Amino acid sequence: MELSDDINQCANLVKQGDHDRYRIIMTLEPKLRSDLFVLMAANIEISRAPWISKENLISEIRLRWWLDAIEEIASKQSVRRHFVTSPLEKILNKSQTKLIKENILARSWDINLEPHLSENELFRYIDATSGNIWAVAAELLGGSQKIGRLLGNAIGVIQYCKASNELIL
């Protein structure tokens, strides 16, 4: 399978899994879209991992799979074949893989669904998940991680409120 096939699969995953982000990416110039489709597809796969099973162990294994894959990318080892990891390897630098690893580790909270103990803990979770993804996205587009993180945190608060409402109702 060619890398362009992987990127097309990533774009389709984003279109189906997060139509709002898909529409945001489609407003960019075509040459800027590929990297963001790959990054956002990774985010979808990682964010779904805690929810794939009611069995916590299965969800933990899935998150571990992603953590191992990102560690392979960071260490420049041979990366496991997956339609997201193969192109992701081509776009992430070492500092960006660190942010993705923090995202994965934060997602373990989703497995147990324990309440955040404080407002600060909640905002650390949002920063590690949404803030980190948008920080990497901004950098991939040639912008500042700081601006991307601010945008990501704002989006993360909105998404958290939306998800909390859906979980409550």
Predicted regions and their residues:
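Acidic catalytic motifs of isoprenoid enzymes
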Residues: 1-169
